[in-house]
A protein has these predicted regions:
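Short S/T/G/P-rich N-terminal loop/turn motif that feeds into the first structured element of a domain
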Residues: 1-110, 120-139
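Short, surface-exposed beta-strand/loop patches at domain edges
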Residues: 113
């Protein structure tokens, strides 16, 4: 089975300063995208199935491509060295509404459902939402 434990639901707003509350918009760029930092920590493999290697393979095989097809900008992917069962992603979207649309269509995609079934990896997922500062080189 596929299980996810979400550390932060519902997520905070993110994106350009104009769509944020005054308290959140301070120092945020007007042209900032919505950035999402994701930590996926895989549970150990059981009987040779699941685990971090299956998670990496799922990402390699199709998950990243599918997210891009649905509109996500996949900025970078990292392997944590202090916890090798954790993969870190940085994604970007036009704004929070766009992010929610991307994930809604992605989660309903039959290719994603088949891929998730093929590589059923229980994970702990942590999500952090950010907006670029007005002096950031990446927006």
């Amino acid at each position: 089975t596929f299980t996810q434990i979400s550390a932060q639901e519902p997520p905070n707003p993110c994106g350009p300063a104009s769509i944020l509350s005054e308290a959140l918009a301070n120092n945020v760029a007007e042209d900032s995208r919505c950035f999402e930092l994701r930590f996926y920590t895989a549970e150990p493999a059981v009987n040779g199935k699941g685990g971090i290697d299956d998670l990496h393979q799922r990402f390699r095989e199709k998950q990243i491509t599918l997210l891009e097809q649905h509109g996500a900008d996949m900025i970078a992917h990292w392997q944590r060295l202090d916890n090798p069962n954790t993969v870190v992603w940085l994604l970007a979207f036009r704004d929070r509404e766009h992010r929610d649309e991307v994930f809604a269509t992605f989660r309903a995609d039959p290719e994603w459902l088949a891929l998730r079934e093929k590589y059923s990896v229980p994970v702990n997922r942590e999500l952090f939402f950010m907006s670029a500062t007005d002096y950031s080189g990446i927006k």
